[in-house]
Design a protein with these regions (language model features):
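Acidic carboxylate motifs that coordinate Ca2+ or other divalent cations, activating on Asp/Glu
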Residues: 147, 151
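Beta-propeller-forming repeat regions
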Residues: 1-142, 155-188
Length: 188
């Protein structure tokens, strides 16, 4: 399994008690995180979070199987994608905005996407009305929940045009027809 593959380098971690440890694979990183460890150096915190995100994505991808039917074969990351995607993908930076987003049906309604820059068939940037932008990347396709229908695993990176805020999230999305809206099967 991918979680136990050695990265070829070590990430130094520590916890508030002063205890330190080095990890070099997803399995050890995940265990250390659950035990309260974080990046030993403040400037490596972003890398620590990115590694956790990537490890979880690999773990979720490992659950994919061959699908019998697909309603995402013609999926395009374009201006319409946010209109068919749940508000769970919205750019949320506070508990208050999270509560508001939950009441809205689509990502587009939550973030008011103003423009889209398509980088490739599997990657696009979405710019919202408040100076935020999200990069969506389709990383895998397959049957996630054993219903025979093809699902997609995506990664979402949130950033702001002026400032230093950033966050990363992963999702498994599905839909039951070519025109149907997507639903979230898993989120991390």
């Amino acid at each position: 399994m991918r979680n136990s593959f050695d990265w070829g380098y070590e990430l130094e971690l520590s916890r508030t008690s002063g205890e330190t440890k080095s990890v070099s694979n997803c399995k050890d990183l995940t265990k250390a995180n659950l035990a309260g460890f974080t990046a030993a150096k403040a400037y490596e915190y972003g890398a620590f979070k990115a590694y956790l995100m990537q490890c979880q994505t690999w773990s979720e991808m490992a659950k994919l199987a061959a699908s019998k039917r697909s309603f995402i074969s013609k999926l395009k990351l374009d201006d319409n994608f946010p209109k068919f995607t749940p508000s769970a993908l919205a750019f949320v930076i506070s508990d208050e905005s999270e509560e508001k987003v939950k009441t809205l049906p689509t990502w587009d309604e939550a973030d008011h996407i103003q423009s889209t820059r398509v980088a490739s068939e599997v990657r696009a940037e979405y710019f919202d009305a408040t100076g935020g932008f999200q990069v969506i990347t389709v990383v895998a396709k397959g049957d996630y929940n054993a219903d025979g229908i093809e699902d997609i695993v995506i990664e979402k990176e949130n950033s702001v045009l002026s400032g230093s805020y950033s966050s990363s999230h992963g999702y498994v999305l599905t839909r039951m027809s070519e025109q149907a809206s997507f639903t979230v099967l898993a989120e991390w």
